[in-house]
Design a protein with these regions (language model features):
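N-terminal signal peptide c-region/cleavage motif recognized by signal peptidases
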Residues: 14-18
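Compact alpha-helical subdomains of small soluble proteins
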Residues: 37, 64-128
């Protein structure tokens, strides 16, 4: 019994520490966002409504976690707007589709809805 426990602990200890698995990659999120577009156009397939809701729920979760910490909420911003911003951003970066989806969503929302201090820094950096 002790030998089995020691062996199990040793095997766990040999697992790579740097390995991680994100819930969604950018590619997986975009697949679900595309399903949402099909639903909106009335050409949805079986499972598209579920996939669309999953994508929107994921984006809403990222928004709720990072609002004010990274980007600023504006009165009247809808989940539909946040979803559209995310869809456009992820589509424009196919070379990053392997990255964690939460990271891409956060970047998309940060660029679309920067806090006032960040807006001023962006303007100064662009020479505006």
């Amino acid at each position: 019994m002790k030998l089995a426990t020691v062996a199990a602990v040793a095997l766990i200890g040999m697992a790579p520490l740097g390995a991680r698995a994100e819930f969604f990659t950018g590619s997986a999120l975009l697949t679900r966002l595309d399903a949402g577009e099909r639903v909106d156009r009335g050409t949805g397939q079986s499972g598209d409504e579920f996939d669309s809701a999953l994508a929107m729920g994921f984006i809403a979760g990222v928004y709720d976690v990072f609002v004010q910490a990274s980007f600023c909420s504006r009165t009247g911003v809808t989940l539909g707007q946040a979803t559209a911003v995310t869809r456009m951003y992820v589509r424009a970066l196919p070379h990053r589709h392997h990255e964690p989806a939460y990271k891409l969503v956060r970047e998309a929302l940060d660029r679309a809805f920067p806090c006032e201090g960040q807006r001023q820094q962006q303007r100064q950096g662009q020479g505006v």
